[in-house]
């Protein structure tokens, strides 16, 4: 009834988040959700003021697509931008929408 997939979550600076979402689609994601993200971490507190807004991008993908996306993030975004990403296992109804 459910399909085992990966949830990839990326939190990135507003300036680069749309490009990351574009890369995710190009690498095989069938869609994504992007919302404002507020919080605090190693680079200080992000309150969502102009110029310091972070966006959270979520996509449900296959393991193979998740690996491609993580490799792209590691090579092209982590060295230059305040960006973080993580993967989680998810069980999805209507899994055909994601693969």
Protein language model annotation of sequence segments:
Residues 1-99:
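Positively charged, small/polar-rich N-terminal and surface patches that mediate targeting and assembly
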């Amino acid at each position: 009834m459910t399909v085992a997939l990966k949830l990839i979550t990326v939190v990135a600076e507003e300036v680069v988040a749309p490009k990351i979402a574009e890369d995710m689609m190009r690498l095989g994601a069938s869609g994504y959700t992007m919302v404002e993200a507020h919080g605090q971490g190693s680079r200080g507190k992000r309150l969502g003021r102009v110029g310091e807004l972070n966006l959270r991008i979520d996509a449900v993908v296959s393991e193979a697509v998740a690996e491609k996306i993580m490799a792209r993030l590691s090579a092209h975004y982590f060295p230059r931008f305040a960006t973080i990403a993580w993967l989680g296992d998810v069980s999805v109804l209507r899994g055909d929408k994601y693969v």
